[in-house]
Amino acid sequence: GGNVLITAAGKVSYGKEVVQQFTPVFWNTSWFKMRPPHTTGILVNPKHPLFRQFPTEYHSNLQWWELLNRAQVMQFTHFPPAFQPTVQSIDTWFISRKIGMLFEANVLNGKVLMTSMDIISQPEKRIVARQMHKAILDYMNSDQFRPQFTVTPQQISELFTKTAGDIKSYTNDSPDELKPKIN
């Protein structure tokens, strides 16, 4: 019945195939044979209580560099359809999986907040990670920590055990919408 913080940086399996960097994919991953990065940015709700101590806009800015660049993402395709992660990575446009790096949920009689961002290593050298860690702990210890979504322990466990299939969705040709029209 308590609150649990799961720091899963480097330990996630389901989502491991998606490479995130701070800078978004250049133009189109299918043209570059799915070479990384695979994401086109992040989406966050800047009014969420977690971000009172980690100010942000609805997208990434420079304060996110340390947390996003080369961070692992989690894939949520096995979570409830309405589920929204607190920090949602935006997948490449033609695959559009639900992926993210931080979520909160009700689980059994307790509440969990899980992140795949590295918020704990070398806190003396990483002020951004240290501040995000503090913001998370303060949020979880407040009466504002009221997750909207419910997931099962198995759904969380599958983030560490499940693997996604390979995606080979690149082309040797131009996408149809960019081909010249020949009469």
Map each language-model feature to its residues.
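Short, solvent-exposed loop/turn segments at secondary-structure junctions
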Residues: 4, 11-13, 107-112, 118-121
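Short, surface-exposed beta-strand/loop micro-motifs that present aromatic residues
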Residues: 97-107
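Hydrophobic targeting/anchoring helices
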Residues: 116, 146-147, 160-166, 170
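Short, Gly/Ser/Thr-enriched beta-strand-loop segments that form substrate-interacting elements
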Residues: 78-99
